[in-house]
């Protein structure tokens, strides 16, 4: 069996003796020629590519670029590809050809992409996307080049660039050299010193899920360089849907996942949603098991993880399987309940921190579960120092910092110490992020309030997304729901949220609640940008409806940038948290909705008696019944377990059931 500990020691020794350039990184990384560099599904079978095979393709692509564009050597080349073998070939091939890769944010609007490319004086773009007609496009899927066993004898470039904002607002370009990446690789050594779980594999392998795009600093530094520098295996996905992610993790026996909280929040919601449909006995059994698991993991952490996986075998089998050994959440706030449940069932999940400008700088690595679920982002890695500015924001000093920031206003190279704008506090040497300074809201008494403090404590069950932010000078909550999501469920959820706000820190400062059926963030966003949300509201792309006016009408009028005259007359103490739907309205609305679903399933316009049996009185078939179940499940966002609930035959049966679970 491979000695991972010795391999790490040898690789680190080799890179420390070098000049710490990208070529040096490549030489050490690709010295493990027969190790599997990456794998993916091709024609429903797992295809594996070794570091030797990948290196030959990289050498060939580098020669192609050098021969095709000799006049561009030393310049930036744009790179816009999804995570794939072709991305790796292109990334390293560009560097080997003497050019500098600029990792284009694929989610940016076309105009912004072009503006940033122009800023870097880019002429060539490696891509298979069709929005670069103004540039010389090289499609690695179509261009012809031969695999070469030896690389070019030319000077490598030692610089890469990527954008600093996922939203595109105030986008800047951060430039890293090989030394900064070596600093990130050294983080792996810091992690191993504090927690050896990072080097645990499954069936002798360590496999990392390539989930987050490599144009994102977290995707590039954590998912790729952190472990692949030691000859580990990347696993690529066909797409990012939940079913595909779950299937790939299980099929490929993925061991390590570094991802934004959205992945872990989806996992948490899926588990809790399924659990809510189970019997009371099953739920009590689960909760008892969770208490036992957490207690053991606080005394014997690694043994406790093994026990948890046995206690929750059914949950493990239904989600990511039994191969997961180490996961890190980063890029945004993760809910403590999600941390507790995921760690509790036996998936070690740690909370990390970093920015585009600083790369990944800390992870909460203490093994006891009480620390893993605390919300801490840990202590900084070796060689990195945290300090607090006069404005109580985090400052980062260390070797992972980018070496240059390019903006439309000029360049900044004085980056030994970078101010992150994140409000933090330290507790016994471990750090907690409490919000962004530029998101602070000034309360009526002049106190600075971080919307994140409210948002991080608030429990919202059914909304796709939500955000606490300043709308028209008032601290407000925006809730996003699907177009067809029932108004009744929204009303019940808002009622629960209002109650919850009473016990949340600064919750009573929230003056208005808004409902929208429009997406308040891009599908691929790591987190919701408040500035971008307000921009979309101002442009009419997100239509907000104040909950006071919410009456089940799906048509929502766009809000203007400025408050209406009626809103202007509203005093600062008036609140939207006052209107409650009556119980009779709830009952009438839900019964009517279920009756309409009965009609659709039976393909009839006849009135449905609320006490009529679906089969005996209404003549429904088994196929009709499953149509009804699917309609109700999708519309009310519930998972009806027919093995547990086998007595749902009438409108009133379904109404009673929905009132119990919603």
Language-model features: where?
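Thiotemplate assembly-line natural product biosynthesis machinery
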Residues: 560-608, 627-635, 647, 652, ...
């Amino acid at each position: 069996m491979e000695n991972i500990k010795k391999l790490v020691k040898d690789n680190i020794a080799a890179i420390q003796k070098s000049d710490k350039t990208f070529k040096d990184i490549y030489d050490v990384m690709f010295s493990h020629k027969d190790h599997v560099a990456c794998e993916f599904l091709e024609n429903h079978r797992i295809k594996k590519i070794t570091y030797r095979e990948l290196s030959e393709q990289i050498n060939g692509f580098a020669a192609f670029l050098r021969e095709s564009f000799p006049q561009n050597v030393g310049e930036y080349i744009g790179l816009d590809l999804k995570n794939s073998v072709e991305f790796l070939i292109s990334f390293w091939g560009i560097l080997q050809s003497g050019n500098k890769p600029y990792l284009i944010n694929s989610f940016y609007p076309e105009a912004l992409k072009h503006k940033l490319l122009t800023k870097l004086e880019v002429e060539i773009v490696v891509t298979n996307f069709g929005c670069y007609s103004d540039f010389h496009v090289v499609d690695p899927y179509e261009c012809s080049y031969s695999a070469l066993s030896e690389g070019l004898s030319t000077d490598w470039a030692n610089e890469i660039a990527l954008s600093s904002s996922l939203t595109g607002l105030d986008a800047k370009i951060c430039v890293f050299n090989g030394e900064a990446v070596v600093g990130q690789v050294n983080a792996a050594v810091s992690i191993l010193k504090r927690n050896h779980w990072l080097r645990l594999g499954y069936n002798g392998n360590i496999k990392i899920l390539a989930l987050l795009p490599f144009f994102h600093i977290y995707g590039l530094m954590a998912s790729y360089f952190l472990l692949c520098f030691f000859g580990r295996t990347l696993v690529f996905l066909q797409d990012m849907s939940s079913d595909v992610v779950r299937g790939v993790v299980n099929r490929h026996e993925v061991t390590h996942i570094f991802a934004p909280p959205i992945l872990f929040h989806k996992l948490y919601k899926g588990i809790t949603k399924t659990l809510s449909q189970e019997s009371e006995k099953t739920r009590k059994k689960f909760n008892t098991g969770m208490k036992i698991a957490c207690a053991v993991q606080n005394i014997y952490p690694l043994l406790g993880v093994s026990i948890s996986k046995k206690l929750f075998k059914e949950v493990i089998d239904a989600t990511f399987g039994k191969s997961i050994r180490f996961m890190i959440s980063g890029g945004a706030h993760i809910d403590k309940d999600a941390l507790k449940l995921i760690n509790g069932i036996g998936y070690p999940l740690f909370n990390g921190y970093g920015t585009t400008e600083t790369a990944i700088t800390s992870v909460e690595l203490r093994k006891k579960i009480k620390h893993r679920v605390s919300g801490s982002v840990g202590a900084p890695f070796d060689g990195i120092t945290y300090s607090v500015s006069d404005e109580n924001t985090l400052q980062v000093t260390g070797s992972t910092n980018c070496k240059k920031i390019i903006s439309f206003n000029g360049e900044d190279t004085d980056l030994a110490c970078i101010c992150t704008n994140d409000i933090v506090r330290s507790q016994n040497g471990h750090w907690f992020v409490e919000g962004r300074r530029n998101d602070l809201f000034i309360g009526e008494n002049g106190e600075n309030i971080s919307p994140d403090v409210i948002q991080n404590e608030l429990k919202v069950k059914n909304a796709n997304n939500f955000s606490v932010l300043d709308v028209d000078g008032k601290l407000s909550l925006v809730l996003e729901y699907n177009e067809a999501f029932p108004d009744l469920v929204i009303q019940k959820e808002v009622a629960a949220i209002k109650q919850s706000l009473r016990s949340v820190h600064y919750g009573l400062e929230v003056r208005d609640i808004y409902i929208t059926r429009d997406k308040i963030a891009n599908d691929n966003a790591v987190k919701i940008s408040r500035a971008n949300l307000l921009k979309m509201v101002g442009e009419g792309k997100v239509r907000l409806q104040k909950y006071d006016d919410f009456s089940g009408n799906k048509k929502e009028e766009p809000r203007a940038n400025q408050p209406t005259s009626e809103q202007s007359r509203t005093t600062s103490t008036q609140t939207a948290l006052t209107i409650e739907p009556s119980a009779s309205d709830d009952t009438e609305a839900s019964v009517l909705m279920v009756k309409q679903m009965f009609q659709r399933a039976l393909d009839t316009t006849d009135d449905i008696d609320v006490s009529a049996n679906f089969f005996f009185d209404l003549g429904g078939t088994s196929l009709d019944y499953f149509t009804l179940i699917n309609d109700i499940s999708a519309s009310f966002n519930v998972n009806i377990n027919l093995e547990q609930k086998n007595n749902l035959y009438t409108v009133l049966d379904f109404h009673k059931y929905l009132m119990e679970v919603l």
